[in-house]
């Protein structure tokens, strides 16, 4: 077994939240129990598409927002 990863602190929907260092946005969405295609995401005020979440490693101090996608026509 590997050693536990250190924790980083970030803001999740305006509240303090910690995750292991190296966690991706995709991993956090799943760990929080969300269905990935039912939630939209932004980090530091910038929208992050579902296809880009696995590549977006969270950093100490990031501000993450999870919200319902807006659909319609």
Residue ranges, per PLM feature:
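Ubiquitin-like/PB1-type beta-grasp interaction modules and other compact soluble beta-rich domains
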Residues: 1-72
